[in-house]
Amino acid sequence: MFMGEYHHNLDSKGRLIIPAKFRDEIGEKMVFTRGMEGCIFGYPIEEWQKIEAKLAKLPLTKRSARKFTRLFYSGAMESEFDKQGRVNLTMTLKEHAALIKECVIVGVSNRIEIWSAERWNDFSEEANENYDDIAEDLDDIEL
């Protein structure tokens, strides 16, 4: 399970270090793709395979399913970590998440998320202001 918030910068070659705590759980490689709210989702291979199985069940006749899977897969990349624990994300993913220098890597249960520091700060500020309301909307799962 992934949890926590880590701050790292893209290096001069556009590579990003993934925290050792996450790498230990991930293994040698993972899949990155477009995430929601302008971030990047990163999945260990086993989790990615579960998502692939679910996406394969979406109806081809439904336009929203076609659009989503098209965007989700076209932005996806498999990546191995280099010896320093860095990944080299595609330009498509960096542009999607507006990654320029400062990044925030967040653990979210079965995935990691990579955010630009600016977008993460905006999201966190808004979410923290509405934390109780968000929790109330989820009351049916009985946290």
Curated annotation (Swiss-Prot):
Pfam families found in the cross-reference section: MraZ
Swiss-Prot/TrEMBL keywords: Cytoplasm, DNA-binding, Repeat, Transcription, Transcription regulation
Subcellular location: Cytoplasm, Nucleoid
UniProt xrefs under InterPro entries: MraZ, MraZ_C, MraZ_dom, MraZ_N, MraZ_sf, SpoVT-AbrB_dom, SpoVT-AbrB_sf
Residues of the SpoVT-AbrB domain: 5-47, 76-119
Major place of residence: cytoplasm
GO annotation (BP), single: negative regulation of DNA-templated transcription initiation
Gene Ontology CC terms: cytoplasm; nucleoid
GO MF term list: DNA-binding transcription factor activity; transcription cis-regulatory region binding
Secretion signal span: none
Similarity-based family: Belongs to the MraZ family.
NCBIfam families named among the record's database cross-references: division/cell wall cluster transcriptional repressor MraZ
PANTHER family in the record: TRANSCRIPTIONAL REGULATOR MRAZ (PTHR34701:SF1)
Subunit structure: Forms oligomers.
The protein, known as: Transcriptional regulator MraZ
Native source species: Lactobacillus gasseri (strain ATCC 33323 / DSM 20243 / BCRC 14619 / CIP 102991 / JCM 1131 / KCTC 3163 / NCIMB 11718 / NCTC 13722 / AM63)
Origin organism lineage: Bacteria, Bacillati, Bacillota, Bacilli, Lactobacillales
